[in-house]
Swiss-Prot record:
Residues 1-25 are annotated as: Disordered. This is Dual specificity protein phosphatase 12. It catalyses: O-phospho-L-tyrosyl-[protein] + H2O = L-tyrosyl-[protein] + phosphate; O-phospho-L-seryl-[protein] + H2O = L-seryl-[protein] + phosphate; O-phospho-L-threonyl-[protein] + H2O = L-threonyl-[protein] + phosphate. GO terms for cellular component: cytoplasm; cytosol; nucleoplasm; nucleus. Binds 2 Zn(2+) ions per subunit. Its main location: nucleus. Dual specificity phosphatase; can dephosphorylate both phosphotyrosine and phosphoserine or phosphothreonine residues. Can dephosphorylate glucokinase (in vitro). Has phosphatase activity with the synthetic substrate 6,8-difluoro-4-methylumbelliferyl phosphate and other in vitro substrates. Substrate binds at residues 115-120. The modification N-acetylmethionine is found at residue 1. PROSITE patterns: TYR_PHOSPHATASE_2 (PS50056), TYR_PHOSPHATASE_DUAL (PS50054). One of its GO terms (molecular function) is kinase binding. It is found in: Nucleus; Cytoplasm, Cytosol.
Amino acid sequence: MLEAQGSNHGCERQAPTASPASSAGHAVEVRPGLYLGGAAAVAEPGHLREAGITAVLTVDSEPAFPAGAGFEGLRSLFVPALDKPETDLLSHLDRCVAFIGQARSEGRAVLVHCHAGVSRSVAVVMAFIMKTDQLTFEKAYDILRTVKPEAKVNEGFEWQLKLYEAMGYEVDTSSAFYKQYRLQKVTEKCPKLWNLPQELFAVDPTTISQGLKDDILYKCRKCRRSLFRHSSILGHSEGSGPIAFAHKRTAPSSVLTTGSQAQCTSYFIEPVQWMESTLLGVMDGQLLCPKCSAKLGSFNWYGEQCSCGRWITPAFQIHKNRVDEMKMLPVLGSQTKKL
């Protein structure tokens, strides 16, 4: 806080002009009009106004401005988040980036802050500059540490920002990256899975009367019942083969890929609606065809190792030799034809 100096030997000294960073409580300017700081930056709302900051994004356990606080003209957004690796920050990034972008387009100066100003707020600002400048995680991190050397996002946020980059700087809920991430988050929250969110499940292909253009269905080899679509397959990079079986990897994987795995003997997929009753309340078990009860594979919320050596968590594993791939081609009359 800057204060005017008192008189000295009868001579008045004029108070120095406060910079936006000093008035905002030790916030640093990352981009013109974009500031990064901790709780001290919002301790005195009047300092924000003096600094010309009229938009504040709080990433913390509590909002910076309770109802009625702040000052007239202040725009604020509160994102509840703890500085823990298991915190889901990824799901909020689009909203945060949009808030910052909108405020700056209106000529507002924006402050992004958390409690200490080194992890949560850094992760959000990184997401913004990654998207606006099309930067890699590493490049954005280097930029932030240049202006704020103490910046250090936790390993969970680091993984989430790399997923954000892999999805093209937006949270794509249809992406295999996001589906695998969402499954891992559900596993962390629910040691006893009695109530699974419906959005976790892919639609049962038998409930859709018309196939999508160039769609690929996977059917039970024994009874031909449709089981899942190609879009439900969660790709992964191939492991190092037999040597990978020396230990089991249970840490979150940042090596997801949408490519194919030629040496893998199973598909790892997102849960499908017909699996719901099988998955509730248990951590592992068999996956059986809902029509003929033929064994298709297995599931384990703690994860399974693919034949290529890659550890997948959680795992919904369908053996390739238990299903047939059927490509559906559109024909006249909005029907579909099997290739």
